[in-house]
Amino acid sequence: MKSKFFLIIFYILFIFNSNLFSNENSKTLRVGLLAPLSGPYSEIGNSLLYSLQLALEEIDDENVVIVPRDTGFNNEKKLTSAINDMRSSGVKVVIGPTTFEEFDQVKKYNDLIFISPSNMNPDFSNNIISIGVSLESQLLALTDFIKQQKKTKTIIMYPKNQYLEFIENKLSSLDLKNTSKFTYSPNPEVLTGEIEILTNYTQRKRSLELRKKMFEDKEDDQSIKELERLDQLYTLGGVNFDSVIIIDFGNNLKSVLTSLVYTDVNQDDVLFTTINQWFDESIFYENTIKNLYYPSVNYEEFKKYNNKYFEKFKIYPNEITILAYDALGLIYYAWKTNGQINSINDFSFKDKIKGKIGTFSFKNGKVTQDLDIYKTTNKKFVKF
């Protein structure tokens, strides 16, 4: 299987480079790809390469050529060499870099335009456009959804980790109404205690015990029934919020959800929402939550893309690759619309652009996505 994998990669690179040399004319759109084709993240790089092969087949224009170059991992020398090689090959627009950490290095190449799958900064930044699903787009989609559900007291929860300052800067710039912030430790053992304070768990539990004592010595039917009802409860009284946005993912997200349920937050009264979910089915096995809502790319298109990718390459793609697929379509659209691509301003479209992941807006020097709201229920992803 491994030899077959490398054979396919060789074939794609051969086709890309053969097209490059056979289309030496001004009508050719040469698009660079900066990707880790070697090193610990080579699987992602090769997956990006596969994705662009699919996009090329759908575009079906022999005047579009991909020029892939290896950047390795965290390798400034390789990245510089790759970019210089692209420039000498007539590339004007580049898909990449894949990580925000490399932005400072590519900004100095003012003669090139970079379309990055990163989601860290949706603003047009010098010569870089990031088309990843940004935190801003997700928060705006969620706050609109929460408003539609007539919730007015939202807690935005996020961990005290390396992204703390980044998240707080984004929240400050958005100035979201009817929200308050709550930060927590990524350590599950500390987290539960912090959630207990947030939910006033100790007082609510004490209130229940005091209430039960009022009926323990009474023998009338009404008191007996009330005591039976109270025995079914874990706490008494509600919390002072009606919705939560959890900016976390993976096991950390599951720990937060578990702690909220442990502290007896009523799921019928409080709306649970989160971000950064690429239809991760492991969330199905988080039995504590009945309904979890989140904004995301178009699920049907995402499934179609994954199936098409698997049919051709017999492996499933990394999630980020669908962004590269859309990036090539976006570049091709700009090229066909303008006749050529001269600057980053050629991507300031008046109308919204529909891609595989959803609909993009490129206004006021910023990329935003119109995201759908999904919920996990009965081990399914359901569009709300």
Give short role names for the model-derived ranges:
Residues 3-13, 20-384:
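Extracytosolic ligand-binding ectodomains
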